[in-house]
Amino acid sequence: MKNKAQRLACIDIGSNAIKYRQYRISSQKSKTFAELDTFKRISVRLGTDAFKFKKISSETEQKLLESIIKLKEKADKKDIKIISGIATSAMRTVSNGDKICKKITKKTDIEIKILSGNEEAQLLNFFNYKSFKKEETLVVDIGGGSTEIFYQASGKNLAKSFPLGAVRILEKKDSPKHWVNLKEWLTKIPSENIKNIVGVGGNARLINEIINKHDRRSSIDELRSLKKELENKNFEEKVSFYSLPEDRADILEHAIAIFVEIMEFFPNSCLFDSSWNIADAVIEKKLQENKNIQAA
């Protein structure tokens, strides 16, 4: 018997926030696919504890647990039968990540998988390119603790994760050798080919909203200019002048620094943003692996 599931959800425990994405399962011509139904972002910054102390404090752990319990309660009310949970850079950095994930499972029945950097980068393989040509596109996910990059051309995939993220840089826990590693890896990609740097996640969307809200693309010079502006403003000015969320106001310039570093290798490129998220990849992967899931 097929397991009928009208909705699936994914909880993504990041370094700067918890992201919850809920999907409606649809079928068309014998193909089952997921459509984003609703999403929620909860500001719980694990990265400060993770990158400064290599351990999640009891206070931060409590905030995390309470937030996920509330999400689970809401999911249960909507009869969401299957929930996938992933954790990324902050959780794989700390000494008590496994213990916390087991505690979450015990309290909510949600299994949380701590992704390796490589696993996180490989999920970008599920990115929906839409109008972007694959051979001209670099998919980049800059989070609070790490940056994942994916390139696909002529049947060849290049995927890599680097421990360079906006919160990590804010806390001055980025290492010069990781910047060197990023530069060396980027030389594997034909620089003249890349026209589109597609940023997935909230940092890229915020950057393009500020620079070019209607066209949704930004040049490297525009990014450099915005970075300089942000560096010359205090926290309150960033929030009020740019309407930045408080939990991004202190890190956006650091996300821009990573984008600039990448774009310097690709002189013909512009930064685009996408609403796609690695949670979409997790759900798509689950649908491919479990053929018993279908639309209700």
What are these regions (language model features)?
Residues 2-34:
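N-terminal basic/disordered segments at the start of proteins
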Residues 2-4, 132-133, 142:
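Short solvent-exposed loop/turn micro-motifs enriched in small/polar/acidic residues
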Residues 8, 22, 49-80, 88-136, ...:
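Helical "lid/coupling" subdomains associated with nucleotide-phosphate turnover
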Residues 11, 42-44, 140, 149, ...:
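Preference for bulky hydrophobic residues occupying beta-strand positions
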Residues 11-17, 140-147, 200-203, 277:
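A short acidic Gly-Thr/Ser loop motif
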Residues 31-45, 69, 75-76, 84:
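Conserved ATP-binding subdomain of kinase catalytic cores across diverse folds
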